[in-house]
């Protein structure tokens, strides 16, 4: 790999610094272990393990700063995917200017990968097409999830990879290789496509007495339905919303146009196209961005608000319920005379974590009640 630092136009310039990013680190790896691993490559200025600002737990990546760029380049070319604590790490040039990464230029997406293809194999498969800034197979506790990202230093290299690799069979699986798209772009494509073809209708603000049959009676006059379902909690009580799937797009569109805003038993219905998860996440992201722009400075935490909490839920239990979604700086149940008031707040370190928590936990039964979870307005203190 060359020693030039790429820019979005695909041109190279000398790296001004000799720093490497080290990813996929075992949680027990320390700065001293990094130093001992990379010192044979050349004199070092320092090593650093990045940690959560609140919990101080390691984030799984760090940096190695060499004195000389040539030594950093040698380490990058010869030590990538070596082991520390029995786990292979990923190396790439540290990029203080993140405009290239945020632009998406040169970034490609690969899916339908065989589980045997790891980061090392991915790197060597695609390095023939140009200089790779980073590559990563997305994994969970069970291993590869079957998709990955490769970021080249130029659009030309990315296009070469797409041209040569899209549709190729790797380990008897035909892979898809295409341009990386940000969630907002993918959501816009889904909206455009689904608005012209949707058959699934989302209905909310329906009365407790509305069951599947009554909902079907209300919607069947617009066309034949494939399924009608009122969503209920574990006790069988209606959650106030449901779905109607029609056989044709025309019937679904007519129902939306005619029934949206109509009053049924004193309740004004919301009737619209059922959105896919990617669209809901994109909408939450747009809403957050609008709120964030109103703030004078970027907040240190992203809050979500939880209503309808069971009386048995305290601060510790609230944090436990949401901890799987990311790093929590604060979890608080509002109290009155020693008893919970039925609502609380949880603050995450990033918007992505908060959004995931809202999407997964809204409507989930905790204790004996379904939670109502919403994204809060970012504040200076969370």
From Swiss-Prot:
Q: Report the subcellular localization.
A: Cytoplasm
Q: Which UniProt keywords apply?
A: Cytoplasm, Mitochondrion, Repeat, RNA-binding
Claim: DNA repair is one of the keywords in the record: no
Q: Which InterPro entries does the UniProt entry name for this protein?
A: Nucleotide-bd_a/b_plait_sf (IPR012677), PABP_1234 (IPR006515), PABP_RRM1 (IPR034364), RBD_domain_sf (IPR035979), RRM2_I_PABPs (IPR045305), RRM_dom (IPR000504), RRM_dom_euk (IPR003954)
Q: Which residues form the RRM domain?
A: 18-96, 106-182, 199-276, 302-378
**Disulfide bond sites:** none
Recorded hits in SMART domains, A to Z, give: RRM, RRM_1
Q: In which tissues is it expressed?
A: Expressed in fetal brain and in a range of adult tissues.
GO MF terms listed in the record are: mRNA 3'-UTR binding; poly(A) binding; poly(U) RNA binding
Q: Which Pfam families match?
A: RRM_1
Return the GO cellular component terms, semicolon-separated.
Answer: cytoplasmic stress granule; cytosol; mitochondrial matrix; nucleus; ribonucleoprotein complex
Q: What is its main location?
A: cytoplasm
| PANTHER family recorded | RNA BINDING PROTEIN
* Summary of the function given for this chain in its UniProt record: Binds the poly(A) tail of mRNA. May be involved in cytoplasmic regulatory processes of mRNA metabolism. Can probably bind to cytoplasmic RNA sequences other than poly(A) in vivo.
Could you identify this protein by its name? Polyadenylate-binding protein 5
- Protein's organism: Homo sapiens (Human)
Q: What is the lineage of its organism?
A: Eukaryota, Metazoa, Chordata, Craniata, Vertebrata
